[in-house]
């Protein structure tokens, strides 16, 4: 979860699998690819786009992608969470922490970030039997009660947290400069994955040299994380149809 390689690899792999299946079914696939996704799917879309540009993906022609409402700047997401008195989806924080614990063998990550009993309880809460809302019911949405006071105060200054900041940087996508068309979307009233994260990511990409003719941004006016889904789908279908 919010790990670049394990997110981007399956995007490319499923395209390869679909291409092989099309040959088996005698379906003519022209190789043109459009990528779209929302929330974590937005991150996956941008990650897949990046990997397709930077790796050999013979047989595929990426026409455009449309990542929506993802947390592309992971350090920015951490700063957003830490700045809030409360956050209504605390299981997201546990999800990222457990992912990085597994990928990086970060044995202290749960106790570094979370207070008890949450640091002990989190692995069992993510055993696959509970929904996100059910996990939330076993956590607190008050950040000062969920998170360790030390990390809230010192994540940017104490070297013990360097491994976290390095992981955030490695897996963030805000320094990617796309050369194939990308249309970003985000709801302006989104407080689940903050709108500003997409704005900052877009501005970073432009500052680093992305062409406004390649990279564009569509604000979904007054849309929350939930209410932005339908207008995004409607617009992206029309946009992709025009690019075919």
PLM features: residue spans?
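Alpha/beta-hydrolase active-site loop
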Residues: 2-24
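Short beta-strand/loop motif that positions the catalytic acidic residue
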Residues: 35, 178, 183-190
């Amino acid at each position: 979860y919010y790990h670049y390689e394990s997110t981007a690899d399956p995007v490319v792999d499923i395209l390869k699998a679909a291409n092989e299946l099309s040959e088996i079914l005698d379906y003519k696939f022209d190789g043109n690819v459009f990528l779209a996704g929302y929330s974590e799917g937005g991150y996956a879309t941008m990650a897949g786009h990046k990997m397709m540009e930077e790796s050999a993906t013979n047989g595929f022609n990426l026409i455009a992608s449309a990542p929506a409402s993802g947390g592309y700047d992971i350090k920015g997401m951490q700063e957003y969470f830490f700045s809030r008195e409360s956050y209504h989806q605390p299981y997201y924080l546990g999800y990222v922490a457990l992912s990085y614990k597994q990928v990086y063998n970060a044995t202290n990550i749960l106790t570094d970030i979370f207070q008890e009993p949450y640091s002990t309880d989190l692995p069992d809460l993510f055993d696959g039997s509970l929904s996100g809302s059910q996990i939330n019911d076993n956590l607190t949405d008050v950040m000062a009660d969920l998170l360790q006071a030390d990390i809230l105060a010192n994540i940017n200054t104490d070297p013990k947290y360097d491994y976290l900041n390095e992981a955030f940087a490695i897996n963030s996508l805000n320094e990617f400069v796309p050369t194939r068309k990308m249309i970003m979307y985000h709801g302006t009233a989104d407080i689940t994955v903050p709108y500003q994260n997409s704005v900052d990511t877009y501005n970073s990409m432009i500052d680093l040299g992305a062409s406004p003719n390649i990279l564009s941004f569509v604000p979904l006016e007054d849309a929350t994380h939930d209410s932005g889904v339908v207008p995004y789908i409607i617009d992206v279908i029309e946009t992709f149809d025009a690019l075919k």
